Amino acid sequence: MLALNTLLPASAGILFLIQSCYHLGLYRRLYLHSQTQKEGTDTPPLSIILVAKDAASDLQKNLPAILEQDYPNFEVIVIYEQSSDDDCEDVLKLFSEKYTNLYHSFIPDSARYISHKKLGITMGIKASHHEWLVFTEPNCRPSSNQWLRKMARNFTSDTDIVLGYSNYERVNGWFNRQITFDTLLSSMRQLGRAIEGHPYTGCGRNMAYRKSLYYKQKGFSSHLSLQRGEDDLFINQVAKGTNTRVEVSP
């Protein structure tokens, strides 16, 4: 019993040390990447696509930070689900009066037996005017007005996908600290593997890819029956070490 009582803490300590070294290595890799990555100089026109559901308050809070990005030519397309208890349409109409680059449409109630998120993204892509598509979500807000410029510096001629960093906003409370830490570790693993040349997933809160890549893959046809997968499964299918770049600035 004494040996067991000694062995368990020792094993836990070794495991903790291994995990710590692993994550410190990931952090170092991300830091070095941010200091040494080669940047593109073009600012191609962009289409930002969001799909909203019961998100009127989130759009009212976060959409201005997206629409007021310091970037020469971009459009914002919001596709929302019709809902009797949501004011998305009113919020978007109000913003459209101020921002001429905002476009919006809705997913009809008759759309059934298909993921509304994937349908909304598909509608947004078909409505878009530009080759480069940037994706985020209504409950997300860029950390500055340079978000699009930082993403666009990765849009080189041999790049099809850009995976961006995202995390939760820090507020008081144990639960927020825990989920923020977990999301940080997840992002480090995801982006770290991509930097190594082995991208395997993406996060719909902050990523970009070419419209032509979407059509070449025939959209989400291979997993259309699944409710999710519009970001992680799609990126897993199309991302390669040679066509994917990473942006670590939020």
Residue ranges, per PLM feature:
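N-terminal membrane-anchoring/stem segments of glycan-assembly enzymes
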Residues: M1-T41, R189, R193
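Cell-envelope/extracellular polymer assembly enzymes that use nucleotide-activated donors
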Residues: P44-S47, E75
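Donor nucleotide-sugar binding loop of glycosyltransferases
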Residues: A55-D58, S84
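Acidic donor-binding segment of Leloir-type glycosyltransferases
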Residues: L63-A111
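Long helical/loop segments within the catalytic core of UDP-sugar-dependent glycosyltransferases
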Residues: S96-K126, H130, K150-Q217, S221
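Short beta-strand-to-loop acidic/aromatic patch adjacent to the donor-nucleotide binding site
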Residues: H130-R141
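Catalytic beta-strand/loop signature of glycosyltransferases that borders the donor
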Residues: Y165, R245-P250
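Acidic donor-binding loop at a coil-to-helix junction in glycosyltransferase catalytic cores
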Residues: L226-L233
